[in-house]
Swiss-Prot record:
Pfam families: Actin. It is found in: Cytoplasm, Cytoskeleton. This is Actin, muscle. Its EC number is 3.6.4.-. It comes from Styela clava. Actins are highly conserved proteins that are involved in various types of cell motility and are ubiquitously expressed in all eukaryotic cells.
Length: 378
């Protein structure tokens, strides 16, 4: 970068499947956090001059959800609708952060084992549509480790679209041992919709799914012992909680509170053949060199919104202790700000002086094209 660009703060944008977290490098929290949603009206507008738009993004889409069809352009961490994604980035830059993207280097994030075309297209849109001076794509779990102040550990990052385990030793990610699981918050929301329907509460539309997501975030928790908790729920009403729907109707939920997140440990609940998050973590550690496993066991870092359930750290501790050698010291680190730790790590990374030579500049992009991203970003 030339001297004239030093005063430009980098933008950090963690575009998750469920929430976009964006802000400026060096800040300790994101300025803007809004749902990664684009909504389109599902009815004909009849009142003239109301300035009705053909699409709404983020919080505005959320507040008008009763008349909109909501779509998430990112599914399982992969961008599936680029036009809508451009709308989201446009909204982030111009409406939320109120910056001119051509003046700020931009750090984006993605899940590991994403299709190569995904980050190439991200790079292309940043340089060609938004004309950013420089950009970089970082792996989400690696940023979470930065945020926790460690250089060694295994990160279990679970968001809305994808969960992944990334073992990192002395700052090096170990790509052969990365485990990715396409089971995350959105699948849990869908499962909760299903089991609430069995109780006689019907949730079907894209807008009602948002209500269920709110129920999930407010009332769900992870049981330490699932069978025992089921027995408790069956024999008493002590675990029941009530929730008021937007129309004033009150619903009661009992064992659904912990049956929903239990799916993380037993994916067979939603018909997936995969191992649970405790097993993927263990398998990931076992794929690493025998000499570094001890350090990974002692530094299990949780990150992402789907690790926010009460009880999840204790349950992880219990499950991994059962799998690991009996003498092994196991520590689960669950930082309170872990919902945003990917963003915080990005903010730290983008403001390091040593990182400044890592950016992909506009000039490099013009010379090499979108594939430059595989050479310059891990």
């Amino acid at each position: 970068m030339s001297d004239g660009e030093e005063d430009q703060t980098a933008i950090v944008c963690d575009n998750g499947s469920g929430l976009v977290k964006s802000g400026f490098a060096g800040d300790d929290a994101p300025r803007a956090v809004f749902p990664s949603i684009v909504g389109r009206p599902r009815h004909q507008g009849v009142m003239v001059g109301m300035g009705q738009k053909d699409s709404y993004v983020g919080d505005e889409a959320q507040s008008k959800r009763g008349i909109l069809t909501l779509k998430y352009p990112i599914e399982h961490g992969i961008i599936t609708n680029w036009d809508d994604m451009e709308k989201i980035w446009h909204h982030t830059m111009y409406n939320e952060l109120r910056v001119a993207p051509e003046e700020h280097p931009t750090l984006l994030t993605e899940a590991p084992h994403n299709p190569k075309a995904n980050r190439e297209k991200m790079t292309q849109i940043m340089f060609e549509t938004f004309n950013v001076p420089a950009m970089y794509v970082a792996i989400q779990a690696v940023l979470s480790l930065y945020a926790s102040g460690r250089t060694t550990g295994i990160v279990m990052d679970a968001g809305d679209g994808v969960s992944h385990n990334v073992p990192i030793y002395e700052g090096y990610a170990l790509p052969h041992a990365i485990a990715r699981l396409d089971l995350a918050g959105r699948d849990l929301t869908d499962y909760l919709m299903k089991i609430l329907t069995e109780r006689g509460y019907s949730f079907v539309t894209t807008a009602e799914r948002e209500i269920v997501r709110d129920i999930k975030e407010k009332l769900c928790y992870v049981a330490l012992d699932f069978e025992q908790e089921m027995a408790t729920a069956a024999s008493s009403t002590s675990l029941e909680k009530s929730y008021e729907l937007p129309d004033g109707q009150v619903i009661t939920i009992g064992n659904e509170r912990f049956r929903c997140p239990e799916t993380l440990f037993q994916p067979s609940f939603i018909g997936m053949e995969s191992a649970g998050i405790h097993e993927t973590t263990y398998n990931s550690i076992m794929k690493c060199d025998i000499d570094i496993r001890k350090d990974l066991y002692a530094n299990n870092v949780l990150s992402g919104g789907t690790t926010m359930y009460p009880g999840i750290a204790d349950r992880m501790q219990k499950e991994i202790t059962a799998l690991a050698p009996s003498t092994m010291k196991i520590k689960i680190i669950a930082p309170p700000e872990r919902k945003y730790s990917v963003w915080i790590g990005g903010s730290i990374l983008a403001s390091l002086s040593t990182f400044q030579q890592m950016w992909i500049s506009k000039q490099e992009y013009d010379e090499a094209g979108p594939s430059i991203v595989h050479r310059k970003c891990f």
